[in-house]
Amino acid sequence: MTSEDKTALCAENILNDIYILTINRNIDIDIIQEGLLRKVMDEEESNSILFLEDSSFSKNDISILNVHLKIEDGKNKYNNYYEFKYADINVTIDFYQKECKYSIEKSNMHKCHYFKMMNKINYITEQKMDFKDSILYLYNTINDKNFFKCPCWLNDNKNIKLNNIINDHQQKKKKKNLYDKSVQVTNDVTNIMVNEIQEQKMKKPIFFDNKNDLNNSDDEFNSAHSSLIKINKLLNVEENDIFHNLKGHVYEEYFDKHEDNKNQKDNIESNIIVKDKKDRANNIISEQMKEDYIKNVEEVLSKHINNNKNNNVEDSVSLYSLDEEISEQIDKQHFFSIDKRQDEISNFIQMEENINDHMNDNINKMGKKKHGKENRVVEDEKYIQDDKKKKRFYRNVNDNIPLTVQLANKGNEICKEIIEMNSRYYRDFFEEKILGCGGFGYVMKVKNKKFNITYALKIIRLSNSKYNTQTNNKHINEKDNNSYIMEEAIMIAKLQHENIVRYYDAWVEENVDFFLYKELQNEFKNIKIKIKNEKMKNEKMKNEKIISGKIKNENIKSENIKSENIKSENIKSENIKSEKVKNLYIEEIKYFWNHYKKNKDPNVNDKYLYILMEYCPGKTLREAIDCGFICRNEKLIWELIKQILKGISYIHDMKIMHRDIKPSNIFLQITDNILIAKIGDFGLTTRIGDTQINPSAGTIHYISPEQLNGEPFNEKADIFSLGVVFFEMFHEPFSTSMERSITLSNLLKGIYPEYMKADNKKFQFLSSLLAINPQERCCAYNLLHESVLFTFEKDFTDIYNLIDNKRNCEEVHTIISTLFDKFEYLNSDKILKKEDFSTFQNAKIFTDDLEMRKKQKIIKKKILISLKKRGAIFILTPIILLNKYYINLENTYMEEYNIYYNINKKKENKINNIYINTNKNKNIDNLIYMLDIYGNSITLRNSFFLSFAEYIYESIDSYNKYNEDNLFYKFYTYGYTYKNQIIKSNKHIKKDTINNNINTTINITTTTCNTTTGTSTNNNNNNNNNNMGNNNIGNNMGNNVSNIISNNNINNHMISNNPFYFYNIYPDENEKMFYCILSSSKNVFGNEELNYLSIFSNADIMVSIYTLYNHINYFNKLLFVWSYIDLLEIILKECLDIPNDISYHLSIDLKKNSTLLVNKSFVMSLLQKYKIKDMSKISDHILSLFYIKCESNKVDDYLNNIYNFVDDLLNKKSSLQLKRNTSITPKEVPYVRSRSNNISTSASKIIKYDIQKNVGTKEKGNQNDNEKKKMQIYSILDRIKKINNFICTNTVINNTCFDLFLNYEESIFCNEVIFYVICESKNKEIIAYGGRFDEIIRNMANEVKYKNHANYKYVYNNIKDIYNNNNNNNNNDNNIMNIKAYGVEIYLDKIYSKVIESNEKISIHLQYNPSTDKSQLFKNFVTSCQQNDFACTSHIIQQPLLNDDYLNYSSTKILIQVYEISNLLIAYDLSKKLLTKNISSYTHLSINNVNIKKKIKNFKPHKIQFFITIKSNNTDNSFDALKPINFDNVVYKIVNYDDQDCNFMDQAELINYLIKYF
């Protein structure tokens, strides 16, 4: 590398410089924005947040670094508040401009240090120093001890001049405030003491007769005045002021005659001067010094009492002497020193004045460089205004400190007791610093004394609650306002969200001075009573000790008696000391209260609201915007907007409006290296819908237009404020406040800058936020969940909500640990043996491989990118489809395949399946159907053509609202489709076995399409080739239908009677992508767009892949879909000609009153409210229908009676009786005997109908209608019978499972195939398959197109009628007829297999043949979180597989065992109710009644905690479809995993028991 390359500004050089610099342990460098890493790392491996569209900085030319520089040990250590400890330098590296920009974090730095550092940074910028040299230069600068000496703090050795200035300022202030008070106090005390002494002289005139006594009296008088002098010293009044007020030569002579007293006076003066020089924060005096001094004073006092004759005068003088001596020693250091916070504020004010010129000079220099002279003046004025505002605020806070708190900090025990009893704030929290202020109060950073936790505490002064008769209404309003504020505070305290500043608690306190004022009014009676009680208690204890001592020790020595007397004297002296100290505290409070009251109003009636909040140590969004960093990082802006929207959506869901959304109220906090935005400062919050709010409240430039106009508003006002914030985040920092005001004011008028309009994505989002009309603004939820910008996170949000709602679930803990625990992938070199695959011959064997997963993901991603570049929109299509569009309910049959049947032998791996299936043809109308738990007919998604057709049909109006001719849309999706897999047997079967198998196949069919055309077996073989022909739009529809039906019959016969075929247990899963083009009939772009090369030209899909997934754990997973079907509504509608809307409600009323339908009159009463014609006849029919009962174990007989009832009823309706061409002959065929010994020979019987129709016979309309209605009801009855037989066959044996699934062939779209086969050499495999499918959409417009057709002619005529009457429909079929729908399915699994073929590095030693790639496991069709699983098998716990894996029962904790079919609905009802309580269950139907306690052991590995069995109380276990279910006529037996069991008769008690457990 050349020298130029080493100094060039590139990512590699910057990383090398970072590595070299961080070797120094005092330099830490963090990469904040990953643009630097993107320069040296592959783009695919980046873990950054990706958005749908990249911004203009998508090349990541900008990188942000944070450089943390520390001071070396031993340097710049002055142990002072303003000590410089470290510096945070923000470095912005622009690789495109080839420059570095430096800024410094000033929040933790003194102003003097900040200005000096800015000068150094300006020097670096001017000299254009490189990155490494710049950081080293700054590091050496901060370690220069002389350079960073701050002139703002005091040093004992230096800066004497500044020290004297501050001391003079403080002394003058004290003299001014206390001079007048001291004069008044001095005169008052002097007069009192002189009067007392004169009164004593009047009583004792003998003292004037004796000169010595007179001198003694003068000494007492002088002693009193010396006490007065000391008292004034305690008041911080200088001695000269005292002597000017106390006139008389007596005091001068006193100090001249008595040298000791004069020395004492000098010592007091010197002590006061020294006290002013020392630190006034030192407020602690040793308790031992207090006690020693008080003892000495007591000794002097006792001697003085013994020597003098007049006890009264002596006590009075001694008392004053004692008081002033004790008070002087106790409070010499701190009684009248300035409070610590007051001292800091005064020092801060003085320092601001001293360095004001220095700061202005720096601002002027910076202003000249950036904005010129005009901008410099504006910034100068702004700084001065902010500075004055800050000073004013600190003075106000200092003035509002309660007197009780000030005295308590100085050591006043009475004030401490008042705070302890009445103030939670001052009792539980330390004040650290002020964080900010506002119109409602200020915020203080506090720390809990007990738990040492830091909080932010907002203090709001409430309105004065004092009653005033003249302003009665005003104070009532203030009271209401206070209650309103309290309600809002409590409401806000309930909010808890990741993106909202947490509000922990709120409470109201009286001003603590209010309680001090009450004590003053009561003259401290409570305190005095407390002192008196303590004195009495001590005396009582002393007397008890003396009495007990006399009883026990009658012969006590004199020395012991003396010791007892000494103890009693000590107790007495302690009482005296305590009482005197309390009196001094009281005098102190009285004096300061008078001083406090004269200077300002104490406002003792004020109340304060305290709101305890989460402390966010980071910055606000306002600071991030002003520094100019955030506007360059578009991805960060979108991420922050998303988080803010989440917070706003949450508070709106809680029916709360913020009303003050602005950047300064949004806090940025870094937690675990993740930037989180939190909404705070809910000062203007109110409930949504509150009409008693001030519309104009808020911050200018951020309030909505409706607020400015004084109109009613709702939560959409917060959305407008967010729009202004969003605009500021993208806008560069404003140079002046005037520019900011003009730009933001234009937003209210709908005027936006041109650069914002240029970006369509940003402008559309901003327009949705700043719409002038509130109704046109989007709500927070829609912006977050329905906006294109955030829709890619829907799945993540659903998963997060699921995990968040079920935090205590064991599976959720497993998911979290799996996702976030560190683990290593171990590559195993084991070779799979060929015999290991024998058990899984019907399933693909996959192995785990991390590299393969990555490459498959890359393949899928590249195909998706190709589709996105073509403008396709991603749409989710359902797995389960509605069969009302596709199924033919008549073309159903049931068949059972028993291969290798031998009644005397039981062999493993035998296949015994029962299918409820449709004809195995290629007609799109004859697909497999299933019944869900609600009785709806459904099918699995067998192709994306059908799922997209259903989606388009249901939602076409939203895409083509105005029936436009230029309709053109492109969609794509990916997922799995399912079809039945037919496997060909390789072994020949004996003829007898074949015949037996054919005889056991039972078909229930109503289709006899006997059209014969020139078709043969070759038709089936050549079907794919015919399907891949060119577009054949003009083909004759009748011929197509004829060919389809003919081929269907041949295929049915071939497959159902060919022993070489059998069905696989599970449907085949195919992972696919689907690309769809929807265009109008006049638009010709569809054919051009749907081209293979245009789709795959940009996708390099042939990538090396050598292994596939492992899904062995899902082997033999069971799914059972079951339902009960009610015929009553259909019979009322089809047989009795009752309208649809009436038949539905009437059927409900009849079922509710089924037990009361005993006579015709009651039925007539039910029919009267529906106004039905022929009410008498209909009542007779309904009554006869309800007379048909279902007896025990005779469900088939009951269904036969229903058959006869419908047949007779429809025959009677027919006005013209013709000779029936259709003969229906019921034949009872015994059900096939199964291999299990548990099967009863009296099993259910299936009714077989052979229906033959003559196609050439012409029937009249009314007879044809009756036949169609009859066939429809018959088909539903067949379904009910087959479901009943399916559940009650009693053929549940080993290795047998019952699944309802579908049959699907690849070549159903045979008319217009556009996509062909991707060929390599001679191997042809369908990878992409497509065609037109708008005909399917048209067919959906008429649900009865293929329903109930009696013959081929009916089908043909029906098709013609549909095509002829399309233009007459009034529904969305008008839109459907104007579109063309093209689509292509891409088989991802086959693409993977092609890649495997082309890859020579196959890691597994198994020959892989793509043609044998048949079936996959039923792995991706799983029930949703709001649906339970049902199974039907005798062995729920399967035998362990080769890898010792068991079935995975997901999150199921409860298994419900059912033995009778009649209790299956009860089990379903129980599971549904448990699911509403977030308790999932697995329902199992089995006749194998084994000991439960033995079974429960098998469930321990599956984490199933409860095993519930449901048994009937009575012996009648018949299934009566019309009889209401009695949920309490069963016994619920529950066993836990510890083999503890109990029984419940009531379902509610059982559910409560389980809820308590979970």
UniProtKB/Swiss-Prot annotation:
Its EC number is 2.7.11.1. GO terms for cellular component: cytoplasm; nucleus. Pfam families: Pkinase. Auto-phosphorylated. PROSITE patterns: PROTEIN_KINASE_ATP, PROTEIN_KINASE_DOM, PROTEIN_KINASE_ST. Disruption phenotype: No defect in erythrocyte asexual growth and gametocytogenesis. No defect in the production of sporozoites in the mosquito vector. In blood stage parasites, phosphorylation of eIF2alpha in response to amino-acid starvation is impaired. During the asexual blood stage, increased in parasitemia induced by host melatonin is impaired. SMART domains: S_TKc (SM00220). Induction: Down-regulated at the ring stage by melatonin. The active site is at 660 (proton acceptor). ATP binds at residues 435-443, 458. In blood stage parasites, phosphorylates translation factor eIF2alpha in response to amino acid starvation. During the asexual blood stage, involved in the response to the host hormone melatonin which is used by the parasite to modulate its cell cycle. Belongs to the protein kinase superfamily. Ser/Thr protein kinase family. GCN2 subfamily. This is Eukaryotic translation initiation factor 2-alpha kinase 1. It comes from Plasmodium falciparum (isolate 3D7).
